Amino acid sequence: MFVFMIDEKLLAYLEAYLTEKRKTTFKNVLEHRTRHFTVVLEDIYQPHNASAVVRTCDIFGVQDVYSIENKYSNTVSRHVAKGSQKWLNQYRYREDGNNTQICLDALKEKGYQIIATTPHNESCLLQDFDISKKTAFILGAEAEGVSDIVKSQADGFLKIPMVGFTESLNISVAAAIILQSVTTKLRSSKIDWQLSTKEKEILYFDWVKKTIKNVDKIEERYFNNL
């Protein structure tokens, strides 16, 4: 098993390029990050919708976003995402025609239950959803919804209560409603939902590097002076 080791001296060297405010912000945000929940986007046609979901995940502290790209390429719009993509781990499944299955298998291997967001007859209402298990929320294409593969392998179905004439929500709006509800419950629960110390250290190191302009040259200078 690969173990990522952080060069503490290099980190200290790089931290000198950051303000105290930025370092404090990183540490505060990390305290609210979680992998207890994750979001999976399956064949989202409109890139701006996918980008808005990425931004929503950052806002509510969900660290990982998965993208299944059987039909459409999911390119994040920087204008819509507002830079949030920089702070998240994004996993794209686009190499094989069976990307949905490969992604679902990877999620199950990581211990996630698969929850399809769809107005299914057996769907659980959002307010009644049990947050105790690690959950991957699958959001499907704007028109078709989640695929049959997802429906057949889902551990459950989730729907947002609606009482109007319209029976669907924009995918980014749906993601925001779901994540606001489940993360609020999560943070007031006794569930061990936070990242491990090692996970926080790895992300902090990554964020520090992403913040510094020409970081590769700065690292090179550091190693040349050893």
Label each region the model flagged.
Residues V53, D130-I131, V150:
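Structural alpha-helical scaffold elements that stabilize or flank donor/cofactor-binding regions
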